[in-house]
Swiss-Prot record:
Modified residues (N6-(pyridoxal phosphate)lysine): K267
EC number of the protein: 5.4.3.8
Gene, per the UniProt record: hemL
Organism: Desulforapulum autotrophicum (strain ATCC 43914 / DSM 3382 / VKM B-1955 / HRM2)
GO terms classed as biological process: protoporphyrinogen IX biosynthetic process
Cross-referenced Gene3D superfamilies: Aspartate Aminotransferase, domain 1, Type I PLP-dependent aspartate aminotransferase-like (Major domain)
Pathway given in the UniProt record: Porphyrin-containing compound metabolism; protoporphyrin-IX biosynthesis; 5-aminolevulinate from L-glutamyl-tRNA(Glu): step 2/2
S-S bonds: none
One GO CC term, this protein: cytoplasm
Molecular-function GO terms, alphabetical: glutamate-1-semialdehyde 2,1-aminomutase activity; pyridoxal phosphate binding; transaminase activity
Protein name: Glutamate-1-semialdehyde 2,1-aminomutase
Classification via Pfam families: Aminotran_3
């Protein structure tokens, strides 16, 4: 496809924006070439600056579960915009969105709105430390919980793509309070908790890892975390920024039957606008200012446009059979990709949890970050480029998930599988 306009825009952007992008993975550094500059989106499709149309499996990195420009969301935004863009004061929209979250996720009794997933996880960690009076946070290798200093340790997402273990600018005194353990290794967590459990404020984990590629939990892993946190008086934080309202109506915790103490949200609850939230048990959440001593604030928190888009989105998700339909579409995609790879004779594995999918160019079952890194990155890069050339838009990193939306049709999924078969046939 002709992408000269996107290439020119990228060069122009690099004059004014570090690396030409406002989030590192968008630069396409790990797959070569330059990023597409997007002009418009509709349903399951995006259109770049050169007018090329693509079936989109990035979905703005997860929020667009209904597809782009869903009419209910557009209507809600227009109505909210007519009243203003930001007030710096409470609105009824904040209460309604919070109510929808609380109704859908039983572990959440109160919720605080913020502006991003990073703000949500950062605030939840501060709250956990304030509530427990402890300092240590446990996370998992390849688990990306935003770019807050405390959590940018052995992270996935763009950090994995860049091969940076953390980031310059984070003092050792900060990272010293964060312990990172192999994901899905319950025995390793038991050993660490046996030694340091009385100093651990919280364990933070994604119900389904999404930034080392999509990696599901092994059986019993989350149950082990819940048991250990209860035993040692630590809080279990589920980072559901990606999985929240994506893998099931009740989010990851509802799907797996686990009750965390705190939960972080983002992406879908804002309907495509900047938003984040964290919530949990009443007695914990009431430690947040002004109800309690743990401080957190934000000029644009509870922004009325984001709240309106989020309300419209969560209301649409209540439709009977919504998640069953999404799951079936995603299963169709994943099965088709596996079949295409098998026919091509290449090393490949793919899986999904709800409408969140992942693939690796390896025959091994991937259960942690070290195993994810054994994927053939050269083949992934060739696959990404080949698919883009055929009108299929995937995340430009091996260490990201694919997202299917309600707007994707079976015909589009079949076209995606056919394109994949064509590309895979040419891979070594």
């Amino acid at each position: 496809m002709e992408t000269t306009r996107s290439e020119a825009l990228f060069k122009e952007a690099a004059k004014f924006i570090p690396g030409g992008v406002n989030s590192p993975v968008r630069a396409c550094g790990s797959v070569g070439g330059s990023p597409l500059f997007i002009q418009k989106a509709e349903g399951s499709k995006i259109i770049d600056a050169d007018g090329n149309v693509y079936i989109d499996y990035v979905g703005s990195w997860g929020p667009m579960i209904l597809g782009h420009r869903h009419p209910d969301v557009v209507k809600a935004l227009i109505e909210a915009l007519a009243s203003g863009t930001s007030f710096g004061a409470p609105t009824a929209l904040e209460t309604r969105l919070s109510q929808l979250v609380v109704e859908a996720v039983p572990s959440v009794e109160k919720v605080r709105m913020v502006n991003s997933g990073t703000e949500a996880t950062m605030s939840a960690v501060r709250l956990a430390r304030g509530y427990t009076g402890r300092d240590i946070i446990i996370k998992f290798d390849g688990g990306y919980h935003g770019h807050a200093d405390t959590l940018l340790v052995a992270a996935g997402s763009g950090v994995a793509t860049l091969n940076i273990p953390g980031s310059p600018g984070i003092p050792e005194s900060v990272s010293a309070h964060t312990l990172s353990i192999t994901y899905n290794d319950g025995e390793a967590v038991k050993r660490v908790m046996a030694e340091k459990g009385d100093r651990v404020a919280a364990i933070i984990v994604e119900p389904v890892a999404g930034n080392m590629g999509m990696v599901p939990p092994v059986k019993g892993f989350h149950e082990t975390l819940r048991t250990l946190c209860t035993k040692h008086g630590a809080l279990l934080i589920f980072d559901e920024v990606m999985t929240g309202f994506r893998v099931a109506k009740g989010s990851g915790q509802g799907l797996f039957g686990i009750t965390p103490d705190l939960t972080c949200f983002g992406k879908i609850i804002g309907g495509g606008l900047p938003v984040g939230a964290y919530g949990g048990r009443r007695e914990i959440m009431d430690q947040i200012a002004p109800a309690g001593p743990v401080y957190q604030a934000g000029t644009l928190s509870g922004n009325p446009l984001a709240m309106a888009a989020g309300i419209a989105t969560l209301e649409a998700l209540k439709k009977t059979g919504f998640y069953e339909s999404l799951d079936a579409k995603t299963e169709r995609l994943v099965t088709g990709l596996r079949t295409a790879a098998e026919k091509a004779g290449i090393d490949f594995t793919a899986s999904h949890v709800g409408s969140m999918a992942g693939m690796f160019f390896t025959r091994a079952t991937v259960t942690n970050f070290d195993e994810a890194k054994t994927s053939d990155l050269v083949n992934f890069s060739k696959f990404y480029t080949g698919m883009r050339d055929r009108g299929i838009y995937l995340a430009p990193s091996q260490f990201e998930a694919l997202f299917v939306s309600a707007a994707h049709t079976n015909d589009e999924i079949d076209a995606t599988i056919a394109a994949a078969a064509d590309v895979m046939a040419g891979l070594v």
